[in-house]
């Protein structure tokens, strides 16, 4: 069995997608995709020759870095690929020290077969995808136009025509009261009688 390291992966890639890509070159026994942190994965081929064919064909495709796994430390589990290259451990040899789960840290099974898997890793991936939408809905004020409405000018005010000035004299006035002829007194006191006589 031969282990292949795949780097520069899209964090959204799934195990099924990787398995579909690599199984065209041979039998893939297991696939493990890192989630904390994401960006790399390991695949175990049953035949080392199939692993080498996959490396030659897929290295550089989609920006991936595909190579044989050699001594990559405990975290990624890459260093165990060389130890298991000619062995027949597979899934039947669960008692071997090279079978270690990278999800729970226990030996005897792969991370793909871990019962504790799907807990923190999947929850975290769901929490990342639940980012609140940003400005998906356009605000209501954006649909309204703020152009001022055309207002018709107010109609001119009509002034009531003033009555024409009176051209003639008004006859509504009452005539002045009749004044009796004044009697002009004379020195002799008989002025009225003498006046009448003089007229006659």
Swiss-Prot record:
Keywords: Cytoplasm, Metal-binding, mRNA processing, mRNA splicing, Nucleus, Phosphoprotein, Spliceosome, Zinc, Zinc-finger
Listed name of the protein: Serine/arginine-rich splicing factor RSZ22
Segments of skewed composition (Basic and acidic residues): 62-83
PROSITE patterns with a match to the protein in the record: RRM, ZF_CCHC
Example GO BP: RNA splicing
Disordered, as annotated region: 62-97, 112-200
Residues with Phosphoserine modification: 138, 147, 152, 160, 162, 174, 200
Function: Sequence-specific RNA-binding protein probably involved in pre-mRNA splicing. In vitro, can complement efficiently splicing-deficient mammalian SRSF7-depleted HeLa cell extract.
Compositional bias (Low complexity): 138-150
Chief subcellular location: nucleus
Basic residues bias locations: 120-137
Superkingdom of source: Eukaryota
Reported modifications of this chain: Extensively phosphorylated on serine residues in the RS domain. Phosphorylated by AFC2.
Record's subunit section: Component of the spliceosome. Interacts with AFC2, RS2Z33 and RNU1.
